[in-house]
């Protein structure tokens, strides 16, 4: 009986491997991926060119098979209606309120990462299969890169924490803008706060120093302040509705991503084991969603979760912020006070926490012309077959969702749709 044989490096093999890669990336076991809504079932999507995940999650995924590298994808917001109703027998004809829309867009581009799998003699000297190791390492790197790009866009800053685990370079790097594809935008004025140690207040500066002290930490009082601000502001980020969460309507949630140091500061201010138990109980009504498990806790309707890397600013580092509700113009010269250093050493820093509601971030996926999906593998033999290079790639783009929203008598304000940033002081671990 004839057997099907798919040759090494053939187009069919690449398509099969790339489809497997796409599935693996979509199911990667990371915090940020769990904040992405599930894609529609194939039966619902097979006839659609543009497929979008649930907008009830913080990260909205759009798979647009009509797009190619460098193209733009647009998305719209229907502005809320205001004004008074018409009562009794008063004339209503011809007085209908006009719908108005705000629009945002993002670009997609090709990202590639090659890994050398060595040559024939390198393979001879080791018992490890270098080709398999190269593929695994490349996939891990691309997963890390995708999560960090999402984190930086949500935070509106890269920060200055840096070690080998960062795949996204510092903003001063010449390739930073091209790697991020879309501009990294500081939080809008109505979405940027700082801790006072007992509450939050809009970010401000004095004498080129951000108005924050080393005692302005994140604690339970500050999280209560966040909830109070959410309840009192016009058009706050909408609650997150996780798939299968039976309590979503009765007990709405937002998600607060915090650094490890901010997490420790919060834990020390309250009985966190009770909060963990509440999160575990909530997971039972949300289909066992792993986001609620482990270190997560629920406080005052806010699910507190550790972020994968800190967005951190040290003494003397600038924190960009918007001084007007009506423009995206950023103040770029105000810095963390020198008092965050002690005897010339970095002892304290400012870490950014990220509060997420629905539709905070958009990730668009394009189509590779060889594989038919956004992710692809390539393997190439060099030097007459002596050496092997493995390449992983993706066709995508990520951007924070931002609209010029109509606030009625307050006019149209530039607004980050589903994310609020809170800056607070931390003591650097290990110092």
Residue map of PLM features:
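A broadly tuned preference for mixed-charge, low-complexity surface segments
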Residues: 50-51, 126-138, 166, 306-326
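Short acidic, glycine/tyrosine-flanked loop/strand segments centered on an H-E-D-like triad
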Residues: 96-126, 352-372
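Sequence/fold signature of self-assembling virion shell proteins
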Residues: 2-29, 33, 175-431
């Amino acid at each position: 009986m004839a057997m099907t044989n798919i040759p090494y490096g053939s187009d069919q093999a690449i398509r099969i491997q790339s489809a497997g890669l796409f599935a693996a990336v979509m199911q990667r076991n990371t915090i940020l991926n769990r904040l992405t809504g599930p894609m529609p079932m194939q039966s619902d999507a097979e006839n659609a060119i543009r497929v979008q995940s649930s907008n009830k999650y913080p990260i909205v995924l759009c798979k647009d098979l009509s797009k190619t590298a460098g193209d733009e994808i647009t998305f719209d917001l229907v502005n809320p209606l205001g004004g008074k109703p018409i009562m009794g027998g008063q004339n209503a004809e011809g007085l209908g309120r006009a719908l108005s829309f705000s629009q945002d867009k993002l670009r997609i581009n090709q990202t590639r990462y090659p890994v050398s799998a060595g040559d024939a003699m390198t393979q001879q000297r080791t018992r490890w299969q270098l080709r398999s190791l190269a593929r695994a390492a490349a996939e891990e790197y691309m997963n890390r890169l995708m999560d960090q790009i999402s984190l930086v866009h949500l935070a509106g800053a890269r920060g200055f924490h840096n070690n080998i685990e960062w795949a996204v370079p510092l903003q001063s790097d010449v390739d930073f803008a091209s790697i991020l594809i879309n501009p990294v935008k500081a939080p809008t004025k109505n979405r940027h706060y700082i801790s006072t140690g007992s509450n939050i207040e809009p970010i401000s500066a004095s004498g080129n120093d951000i108005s924050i002290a080393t005692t302005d930490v994140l604690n339970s009082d500050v999280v209560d302040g966040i909830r109070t601000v959410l309840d009192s502001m016009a058009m706050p980020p909408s609650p997150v509705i996780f798939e299968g969460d039976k309590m979503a309507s009765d007990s709405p949630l937002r998600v607060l991503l915090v650094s490890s140091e901010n997490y420790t500061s919060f834990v020390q201010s309250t009985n966190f084991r009770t909060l963990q138990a509440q999160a575990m109980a909530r997971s039972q009504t949300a289909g066992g969603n792993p986001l609620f498990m482990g270190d997560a806790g629920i406080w005052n309707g806010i699910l507190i979760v550790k972020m994968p890397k800190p967005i951190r600013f040290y003494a003397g580092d600038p924190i960009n912020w918007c001084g007007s509700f009506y423009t995206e113009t950023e103040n770029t010269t105000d810095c963390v006070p020198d008092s965050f250093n002690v005897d010339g050493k970095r002892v304290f820093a400012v870490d950014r926490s990220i509060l997420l509601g629905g539709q905070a971030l958009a990730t668009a996926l394009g189509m590779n012309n060889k594989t038919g999906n956004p992710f692809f593998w390539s393997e190439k033999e060099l030097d007459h077959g002596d050496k092997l290079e493995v390449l992983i790639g993706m066709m995508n783009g990520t951007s924070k969702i931002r609209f010029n929203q109509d606030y009625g008598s307050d006019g149209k304000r530039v607004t980050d749709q589903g994310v609020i940033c809170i800056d607070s002081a931390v003591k650097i671990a290990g110092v």
